[in-house]
A protein has these predicted regions:
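An N-terminal domain-cap segment
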Residues: 39-49
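Disulfide-bonded cysteine-rich modules in secreted/extracellular proteins
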Residues: 143-147
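Hydrophobic alpha-helical segments and helix pairs
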Residues: 91-141
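Intrinsically disordered, low-complexity, positively biased terminal segments
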Residues: 2-8, 15-20, 40, 53-54, ...
Length: 284
């Protein structure tokens, strides 16, 4: 009997109900997905998630999430381990990429796939390093407080300066997701940074951590981890942010994983020096 091939694969848009399958595969890869990421992800682009099926059984996944008219982000590129090497991943990739409709696409690629991404037109921007460690006890900063609904406009504006696209729909959900805790720092009445920590499969995840200065980032980091003293925490930091890496290394965090931020073309200028921790590897 002939084994099913790519010609037998049916790729369709995934729904939020399919998210447990996708996030389960991601967890099996050691990516430590957040426990309540799905609603925030689908809020940004409900049509940006795809599953490949053979005879109705999920075998592959990918997301191509659009932000406005110029930018998209690719993630969740997965094939069931026992079915790799049969062309299902590439077939899923080709079917889903059309969703970007000419936008510049970004991704955070695992080491094993980076050469394939280069062949598909992606160029390296920088490495992103995941650091893991135990949340330390710290002294609260009076300028840091939990984010409130009234802060949404200010945080959306700050976020837009630190990311290559506006993402108000995503941010509104991300700040208030189940188990998510968001903090901001105001100095002289102006937002100088914000961050979010959330529960995940293996370790608490911080992301984003956007801040004007290392001092702002340190104050936010302390607030984010205040209720997690002794728990394992993970944060993904662009290698270009030496101050961010120094901050976590000082706390005893060590590298555990790396990806490469890659783009297919130019992106809107943003304050990359403020990115002390990326939001997610799946949606950028």
């Amino acid at each position: 009997m002939t084994s099913p091939g790519p010609q037998d694969l049916v790729v369709t848009q995934a729904s939020l109900d399919d998210w447990p399958v996708i996030s389960g595969w991601a967890a099996d890869e050691g990516w430590n997905p957040g426990l309540s990421d799905g609603p925030s992800f689908f809020a940004q682009d409900p049509g940006g998630f795809f599953l490949g099926r053979i005879d109705g059984e999920p075998v592959s996944a990918i997301s191509v999430v659009n932000y406005g008219g110029d930018y998209a982000f690719l993630g969740c590129y997965l094939v069931r381990p026992d079915l790799r090497g049969r062309g299902y991943g590439l077939a899923t990739w080709k079917a889903a990429l059309a969703h970007a409709e000419g936008r510049t696409i970004g991704l955070d690629g695992v080491v094993a796939q980076q050469s394939n991404y280069r062949q598909s037109g992606f160029e390296l921007a920088h490495r992103t390093i995941r650091f893991n460690g135990t949340a330390p006890a710290g002294e609260a900063d009076p300028e840091v407080r939990p984010a409130q609904p009234a802060d949404l406009d200010a945080l959306t504006a700050y976020d837009s300066a630190c990311y290559p696209a506006d993402r108000p729909l995503f941010l509104q959900r991300w700040l208030t997701g189940a188990g998510h805790r968001a903090f901001l720092r105001r100095t002289e009445g102006r937002v100088t940074g914000y961050g979010v920590i959330r529960p995940a499969r293996d370790a608490l995840r911080i992301g984003p951590l956007f801040a004007d200065t290392a001092e702002d980032a340190q104050a936010l980091f302390t607030a984010l981890t205040a209720d997690a003293t002794g728990s394992e925490v993970a944060i993904d930091i662009p290698e270009t942010n030496a101050a961010g890496i120094a901050l976590v290394e000082k706390l005893g965090f060590t590298p555990s994983f790396e990806t490469a931020r890659m783009y297919t073309g130019p992106v809107r200028p943003f304050a990359s020096e403020r990115v002390f921790g990326v939001t997610t590897l799946e949606l950028g």
